[in-house]
Curated annotation (Swiss-Prot):
InterPro entries: F420-dep_G6P_DH, F420-G6PD/mer, F420_G6P_DH-rel, Luciferase-like_dom, Luciferase-like_sf. Substrate binds at residues 195, 198, 259, 283. GO terms for molecular function: coenzyme F420 binding; glucose-6-phosphate dehydrogenase (coenzyme F420) activity; oxidoreductase activity, acting on paired donors, with incorporation or reduction of molecular oxygen. It is an enzyme of class 1 (oxidoreductase). The keyword Kinase does not apply. It comes from the Bacteria. NCBIfam families: F420_G6P_DH (TIGR03554), F420_G6P_family (TIGR03557). GO terms for biological process: carbohydrate metabolic process. PANTHER family: 5,10-METHYLENETETRAHYDROMETHANOPTERIN REDUCTASE (PTHR43244:SF1), PTHR43244. The gene is fgd. This is F420-dependent glucose-6-phosphate dehydrogenase. Keywords: Carbohydrate metabolism, Oxidoreductase.
Length: 336
């Protein structure tokens, strides 16, 4: 059975850079094993939104902590970034903070890429997925330390070398919302990432089996793939506050179809704020009783997920960390 890990999601769309660093430091002090950060050029909402640069945040947190695993959840290495440069950045961080850095990747969203110069209609999944696979292949080659001449459909290098690379390169975690990418994550990734609140069938019958199939096809032990899930949890001893705290994150309750081509935070905010609080809260575990909260989290462990990263929606994150350490962590550790 894979090791149970508890992580903290640093909400880059909600907090300014310095505060976000301090929250990750506090997460380590409160017993978390990892801290992940999203990589947004623009936040989900305009009013009260933030978008600090993920890689600067990771290095700042790396200097202030000693044991937290640090990674993106997730970064898109395929449009506004050149994957060769991302490979260099993560190799450098891997040298600075050995055995603590991982790169979580996904296929991208219009919100972050069109504002930075992508022209034309936002690509459908087929192209975005092809770009992701090619970028992962290029980064893996560069981390071997050799000179790389790469001639892909989307990316090219000529005699490219990364001179400072930790032994073994950097673990890559691949975000998967369906079985096709989950299978790829098992085959090509060191870990895979999914998010909570989407129904038991998705995890038990699609994502986990597909991930295991991909790993086995690649000759890997599926249990060696770190299975991360971002668990959206609004836990507070005050039930009204637990519900109300979810409101800031209403954009997460928009469907993929509703937000596919939205590239403006103001437009995203407008669409999200039209949703009733009941619909917003459906994506979250909303609880004021610790046993109830842990019972709902335990379902994901039963599905086969071992790295639980907790995303709390409220503005008072220190309160959440204190309540988490007092009420939830002791119960959660018993699940492992």
């Amino acid at each position: 059975m894979a090791e149970l890990k508890l992580g903290y999601k640093a909400s880059a769309e909600q907090f300014a850079p310095r505060e976000l660093v301090e929250l990750a430091v506090a997460a380590e002090e409160h017993g978390m094993d990892s801290a992940t950060v999203s990589d947004h050029f623009q936040p989900w909402r305009h009013e009260g939104g933030h978008a600090p640069f993920s890689l600067a945040w990771m290095t700042a947190v790396g200097e202030r902590t000693t044991r937290l695993q640090l990674g993106t959840s997730v970064l898109t290495p395929t449009f506004r970034y050149n994957p060769a440069v991302i490979a260099q950045a993560f190799a450098t961080m891997g040298c600075l903070y050995p055995d603590r850095i991982f790169l979580g990747v996904g296929t991208g969203e219009a919100l972050n890429e069109i504002a930075t110069g992508y022209e034309g209609e936002w690509p459908e999944f087929k192209e975005r997925y092809a770009r992701l696979r090619e970028s992962v292949r290029l980064m893996r080659e560069l981390w071997l330390g050799d000179r790389v001449d790469f001639e892909g459909e989307y990316y090219k290098t000529k005699g490219a070398s990364i001179y400072d690379v930790p032994e073994g390169g950097i673990p890559i975690y691949i975000a998967a919302g369906g079985p096709q990418v989950a299978k790829y994550a098992g085959r090509a990734g060191d870990g895979f990432i999914c998010t909570s609140g989407k129904g038991e069938e998705l995890y038990k019958e699609k994502l986990i089996p597909a991930m295991r199939e991909g790993a086995e096809a690649a000759g890997k032990n599926p249990d060696d793939v770190d299975r991360m899930i971002e668990i959206k949890i609004s836990y507070d001893t005050d039930p009204e506050l637990a519900l109300e705290n979810t409101r800031f994150w209403a954009p997460l309750s928009l469907t993929a179809e509703q937000k596919h081509s939205i590239d403006d935070p103001m437009e995203m905010e407008k669409a999200a704020d039209e949703l009733p609080i009941e619909q917003v809260a459906k994506r979250w575990i909303v609880a004021s009783d610790p046993d109830e909260a842990v019972a709902k989290v335990a379902d994901y462990v039963d599905y086969g997920l071992n790295h639980l990263v907790f995303h709390a929606p409220g503005h008072d994150q220190r309160r959440f960390l204190e309540l988490f350490q007092r009420d939830l962590e002791p119960r959660l550790r018993k699940l492992g």
